[in-house]
């Protein structure tokens, strides 16, 4: 049966945790580029695992040459940046194993990368991993229902509407 409630329901995007761990406020990240939202708003994760997954279905728009950051665009053009760890760019790719390629379509919760935390632990500022949404891609949409605290990969941690 057709439901008018669903027809008129505003489209929203469920954002899944990309990793097991703890979700924290973006303003609590130990880097002013992220905590002052210079690149955009979002949430950060303190990983308790080494596997990172896609927070929603979309297309991989960028993989930094150092394999520590991934851009993903949803079909609605909302785009996020998953930045794994802080100051990880200095590792020049060491400790990061990408599982996707630029231009590849991914499903929600599909494996993006594996990180060898034990190999890089003493060489990074923090393993805090911001998941930010590029302001130009939101176009009037906002991030809501942010879940902080313990999270599992694949669990809904925010809604964009």
Where are these regions (language model features)?
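Contiguous, well-folded functional domains in the mature portion of proteins
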Residues: 1-161
């Amino acid at each position: 049966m057709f439901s008018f409630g669903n027809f008129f329901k505003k489209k929203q995007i469920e954002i899944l945790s990309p990793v097991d761990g703890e979700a924290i406020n973006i303003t609590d990240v130990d880097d002013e580029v992220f905590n002052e939202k210079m690149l955009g708003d979002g949430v950060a994760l303190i990983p308790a695992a080494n596997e990172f997954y896609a927070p929603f279905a979309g297309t991989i728009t960028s993989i930094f040459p150092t394999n520590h950051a991934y851009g993903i665009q949803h079909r609605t053009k909302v785009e996020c940046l998953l930045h794994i760890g802080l100051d990880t760019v200095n590792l020049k790719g060491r400790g990061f194993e990408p599982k996707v390629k630029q231009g590849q379509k991914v499903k929600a919760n599909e494996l993006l990368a594996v990180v060898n935390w034990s190999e890089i632990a003493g060489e990074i500022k923090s393993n805090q991993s911001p998941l930010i949404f590029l302001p130009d891609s939101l176009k009037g949409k906002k991030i809501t229902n942010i879940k902080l605290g313990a999270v599992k990969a694949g669990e809904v941690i925010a809604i964009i509407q």
